[in-house]
Amino acid sequence: WYSSMFAANIKQEPISHHHHHHHAHHSHHAHDSNSNSNASSPHQSPLPSPNPPSHTNLQLEQYLKQQQQQQQQHQHQQQQQPMDTLCAAAMTPSPSNNDQNSLGWLVGLPNPMQTIMPANMRPSPTATTATAAAAAPTTTAAAIALQANDKLQALTPPMDVTPPKSPAKSQQSCAEPEKEHDLMSNSSEDMKYMA
């Protein structure tokens, strides 16, 4: 499809180029003399000149269509073969499953599900608590850094505004870990309840 579009674009370009070229010639000849313009008009031969490209267009289009059809046929054949094999493969195990494994699967499925679900639920609280615990040190480290910054600011107060700022920052930094700890305890308790 892309090749046909590309070929069509290539063919359209020379035709337009041809027309522009001939029009330029036509005006030039008209300036020279009417006889030359008349002689150049058959020399232009606008009807025959597009005809051979259109003819090749048709041939190329037919050729491309044939190629596309062949490709589609090949694709269909390739698709049909795996589909047949897949259908056969799906059909052949399904009776065996129904005969042999269906009861075993029905009996066996709930037990693995029951064992899998708590197993899935158990790691998730540990993961959440681990992430919360990992988040808590970062917040406490940030709070320590904030407190250190506040201490530095308190040690070297460049302005009178910094001392009132530092206690507010320290209060916020102190409150942040508490919030984190509350969230941690709540999440862990919720996960315990969930488990």
UniProtKB/Swiss-Prot annotation:
Keywords attached to this Swiss-Prot or TrEMBL record, sorted alphabetically, are: Developmental protein, DNA-binding, Gap protein, Metal-binding, Nucleus, Repeat, Zinc, Zinc-finger
Q: Where is the composition biased (Basic and acidic residues)?
A: 176-195
Species lineage: Eukaryota, Metazoa, Ecdysozoa, Arthropoda, Hexapoda
| Compartments (UniProt record) | Nucleus
Show the GO cellular component annotation of the record: nucleus
This molecule's function is given as: Gap class segmentation protein that controls development of head structures.
What spans are recorded as compositionally biased (Basic residues)? 17-29
Please report which protein family the annotation says this sequence is part of: Belongs to the hunchback C2H2-type zinc-finger protein family.
Its name, as the record gives it, is: Protein hunchback
